[in-house]
UniProtKB/Swiss-Prot annotation:
The modification N-acetylalanine is found at A2. The active site is at D182. Residues 2-77 are annotated as: Required for cytoplasmic targeting. Residues 78-139 are annotated as: Required for binding to MAP2K5. Signal peptide: none annotated. Keywords: Acetylation, ATP-binding, Cell cycle, Cytoplasm, Differentiation, Kinase, Nucleotide-binding, Nucleus, Phosphoprotein, Serine/threonine-protein kinase, Transferase. The second proline-rich region may interact with actin targeting the kinase to a specific location in the cell. Residues 433-445, 454-463, 578-594, 601-614, 653-664 have a biased composition (Pro residues). This is Mitogen-activated protein kinase 7. Residues 502-519, 527-544, 563-573 have a biased composition (Basic and acidic residues). It is an enzyme of class 2 (transferase). It comes from Bos taurus.
Amino acid sequence: MAEPLKEDDGEDGSGEPPGPVKAEPAGTAASVAAKNLALLKARSFDVTFDVGDEYEIIETIGNGAYGVVSSARRRLTGQQVAIKKIPNAFDVVTNAKRTLRELKILKHFKHDNIIAIKDILRPTVPYGEFKSVYVVLDLMESDLHQIIHSSQPLTLEHVRYFLYQLLRGLKYMHSAQVIHRDLKPSNLLVNENCELKIGDFGMARGLCTSPAEHQYFMTEYVATRWYRAPELMLSLHEYTQAIDLWSVGCIFGEMLARRQLFPGKNYVHQLQLIMTVLGTPSPAVIQAVGAERVRAYIQSLPPRQPVPWETVYPGADRQALSLLGRMLRFEPSARVSAAAALRHPFLAKYHDPDDEPDCAPPFDFAFDREALTRERIKEAIVAEIEDFHARREGIRQQIRFQPSLQPVASEPGCPDVEMPSPWAPSGDCAMESPPPAPLPCPGPAPDTIDLTLQPPPPASEPAPPKKEGAISDNTKAALKAALLKSLRSRLRDGPSAPLEAPEPRKPVTAQERQREREEKRRRRQERAKEREKRRQERERKERGAGVSGGPSADPLAGLVLSDNDRSLLERWTRMAQPPAPAPATARPPSPPAGPATQPTGPLPQPACPPPAPAAGPAAPQTTAASGLLAPQPLVPPPGLPGPSALSVLPYFPSGPPPPDPGGAPQPSTSESPDVTLVTQQLSKSQVEDPLPPVFSGTPKGSGAGYGVGFDLEEFLNQSFDMGVADGPQDGQADSASLSASLLADWLEGHGMNPADIESLQREIQMDSPMLLADLPDLQEP
């Protein structure tokens, strides 16, 4: 056991402990600390999982003061998940209430960027023996803290995409009136596809609606100091969703520089770092400070001017710094909201108002304000587990079995109406309406049709001849039978819904939208993989072309073009090709448009005799539609020299050639140097995947994002002689010393007296939770 350290500077930098400490011999304190550390380590490293036959445990992801997280595989489907075990979940009231709060919140939320509960294992033991809670969550390989402080490339596109997902999930959370209060990189889970999910809702609280709730809001507030908003440190009593936006700004700045923005060693140092960048708070903020001594301390400091963000992050994107400056402000009301941040130009590439939902209804924190005993909390957790399974079984029943629908009462069939043929004689059409009154007319018109009923003709008279095209009786009978059969078939096959009242369209459920988003994400992943494959293939071809052809290799080798781009490239290549060499007998090509003056003098003679006139080539053809000159390729006889020996030039004795009225481009006499540039521009017409490149390998996460608390294994393995004055080390932990109240609550059920806890607290360098107003002395270190 290492020799006990001397007391560090503490939160106030005065070297005095936060409160009265009982003086004990060094040997006694060391033995007590050793015993407590052994107990703490044994309890936290309990990794025995009893998950039955449904899941197969793969490996442990992380462990902490609240539980252990392991990756697992569901045997039925092969899906990989994360299982969080909370051992002895009901021993300490604070921890039990934290578990209940997190279960309720995660059951209420359904969002892509918030960790989701996939299952809660039912207890397999009697109620009296039920002690451990198993929660099945989404499996994420790493967290943002591991990504930032690793050798993994982190481009501006990665930063943009991570920030967008964080704000998208935060907008959904804030719409439910929930404040996370503990946002930090290790609580943001990330996978190899750059997907981000917010985790660890054990510290979440609702909005404060009255001054009486301020104390409730600060209960158990032991969040990481480096990401804590100024209103919490200065007791401004303005606890809104802007608290989370300050944390997001600190995370944003950490991603840009890959180092913490405000890594304070204690409360005073933290406040000094903030004022070094943001300057002295405004008089309104200073007057709102709740403690008189804190207000006097800030006023005694020399005034500071804010430092431009371009100086803090030289070379960073201007739009990124603009958004960062709107997040990190002393006044909570002056900070940008999550919804407004999503509309910032820096995130315009991903912003889609239709795909950034809100949460309805708001989450109810009424249960959290009640004074609950351990037994009542245990009953509430068991009720939450049963409610989760009841809802899931109800959804499955709705999917498997449709509700039985009562058939519609059969109505009497429509009477059969025999429609007369339009070509049938008027005597066959029986009119039931009264005959119209005859109109007075001077004489009978020869073409008038008498619609009045006429007496049937005598039997002796022959029947009028049947006109061509009339509907026969057999056809009428067949149509009547077909209509009757169709009506009976409809009544027999479709009794589930009334014909006159069609079933209303069902609203789109959250699960359907989730499936749509998963399908979109899958397509994006496929496009990203295809793009990566094309890039590797292009690099391979370029390397092969460079080896075989040297500097003269084709610069377009491996470039993938669409059909339209390839067609445009071929046209451009034809335009850029030099004209084919012509023999001496060939006349020079005329301009593409406009009459050219014929030369009056003799043409210059070539250096070789002309070929036979029988094989003379035809004149070049001009396409009228395009106005482009397309000379036919001419093959010189074998006896002629190459094209370099011929020099046939057009001759215009009256001056320069007339301009082309159509403005058509002239064919070039040499290879155009812009073909490569044009080709690359044409290739950009293809739709690009906006997502950043996937990670080739993600570092293993610590499991902190699953809400297991601080990592005891990493914490206890550190050397005890590493004082706080040495400063935090990047990449080792993303939090300063945590609160001793966590340890006190955790060991509450073991009968440890305050002296033992205080001794262990000093041994492992854990500070007591306090506000800046409680510090006995405020002096700059």
